[in-house]
């Protein structure tokens, strides 16, 4: 879909989204863009698991998802975080509809590794027609990253990779990862623009660390001929003003422009 932007909001930044974030989304819509939101919820899931005394562990950066963990993930992502985010959009005058990847079979999924990761899935198909229906009705879809297998089994999907899969499926011309920092930083200084090759080297050199690693890897994997650039932006300050993006632009290659 032309003029479509997929924005992924990490769970750690949801409580810090400023009025400037919503103003940026509003600006996009005023300029005729379709906006799709995908959100995480890791911190809230972690809190609830602790409260309910449900054991959880991470394997290669992904939360191993047993049946007990999956029940909590569903409850927190779709029941709490999704509705809170939809309410925030409404408070800023933006029409949003909360939807899980399970609803309407929006995100079809399969297990990545049932033995090591349990019910953690990868997206295999996206119901593009469902998103098109919501966008045509002038809504902002706010998607919690759960998927459903062909047998009806629900899967926990990493929000970064879900956003990339959705962007590719609907033919978005922009994908942005919203964080609590201005973008990629090197020695405290914002990297305004970098090629995929440069970013891969920064990963190898240990310049990119912690929670930024999965976001950057998802950004790199989302790059394609159809989506030659991806943004990493802040949710605390305006990230889009008067047609200009603020943050780090990762390009597939030198000179790759939309």
From Swiss-Prot:
Annotated catalysed reactions: N-acetyl-L-glutamate + ATP = N-acetyl-L-glutamyl 5-phosphate + ADP
Enzyme class, first EC level, given as a word: transferase
Pathway as given in its UniProt record: Amino-acid biosynthesis; L-arginine biosynthesis; N(2)-acetyl-L-ornithine from L-glutamate: step 2/4
Site location (Transition state stabilizer): 8, 215
Example GO BP: arginine biosynthetic process via ornithine
Compartment(s) where it occurs, according to its Swiss-Prot or TrEMBL record: Cytoplasm
Transmembrane segments: none
Any single Gene Ontology cellular-component annotation: cytoplasm
Domain of life: Bacteria
Reported function: Catalyzes the ATP-dependent phosphorylation of N-acetyl-L-glutamate.
Family named by the database record: Belongs to the acetylglutamate kinase family. ArgB subfamily.
Name of this chain's protein: Acetylglutamate kinase
Organism in which the protein naturally occurs: Geobacillus thermodenitrificans (strain NG80-2)
Source organism phylogeny: Bacteria, Bacillati, Bacillota, Bacilli, Bacillales
Gene responsible for this protein: argB
């Amino acid at each position: 879909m032309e003029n479509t932007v997929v924005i992924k909001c990490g769970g750690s930044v949801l409580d810090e989204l400023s009025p400037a974030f919503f103003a940026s989304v509003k600006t996009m819509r005023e300029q005729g863009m379709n906006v799709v939101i995908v959100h995480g919820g890791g911190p809230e899931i972690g809190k609830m698991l602790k409260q309910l005394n449900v054991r959880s562990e991470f394997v290669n950066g992904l939360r191993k998802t047993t049946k007990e963990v999956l029940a909590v993930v569903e409850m927190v992502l779709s029941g709490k975080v999704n509705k809170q985010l939809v309410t925030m959009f409404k408070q800023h005058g933006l029409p949003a509809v909360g939807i899980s990847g399970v609803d309407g079979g929006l995100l079809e999924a399969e297990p990545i590794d049932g033995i090591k990761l349990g019910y953690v899935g990868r997206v295999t198909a996206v119901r593009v027609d469902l998103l098109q229906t919501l966008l045509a009705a002038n809504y902002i879809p706010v998607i919690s990253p759960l998927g459903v297998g062909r047998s009806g089994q629900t899967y926990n999907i990493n929000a970064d990779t879900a956003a990339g899969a959705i962007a590719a499926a609907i033919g978005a011309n922009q994908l942005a990862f919203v964080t609590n920092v201005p973008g990629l930083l090197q020695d405290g200084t914002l990297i305004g623009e970098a090629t995929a090759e440069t970013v891969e080297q920064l990963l190898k050199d240990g310049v990119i660390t912690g929670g930024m690693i999965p976001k950057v890897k998802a950004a790199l994997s989302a790059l394609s001929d159809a989506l030659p650039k991806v943004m990493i932006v802040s949710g605390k300050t305006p990230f889009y003003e008067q047609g200009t993006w603020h943050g780090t632009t990762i390009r597939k290659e030198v000179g790759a422009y939309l």
